[in-house]
């Protein structure tokens, strides 16, 4: 079984929550367009000035997604 990797985009500022929420829409569109095997996305708000959007990919798709979408960072995903 391959590892799952959580790709993360950071947003800061007063509009960070809305920006992260909107970015998740585009991540879902990318997953559908590229027919990726996992459909795990989300966004989290860490106060008024910081939020993230994320998507989870497999090891096999990590390079493709990283090069196309340029996430700010990544970490291993644990359910």
Provide a role label for each language-model segment.
Residues 2-79:
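Long, contiguous binding/interaction regions
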């Amino acid at each position: 079984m391959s590892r799952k990797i959580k790709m993360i985009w950071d947003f800061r500022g007063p509009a960070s929550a809305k920006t992260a929420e909107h970015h998740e829409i585009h991540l879902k569109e990318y997953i559908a367009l590229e027919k990726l095997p996992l459909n795990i996305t989300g966004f989290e708000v860490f106060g008024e000035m910081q939020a993230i959007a994320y998507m989870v990919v497999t090891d096999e798709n990590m390079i493709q997604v990283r090069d196309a979408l340029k996430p700010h960072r990544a970490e291993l995903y644990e359910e």
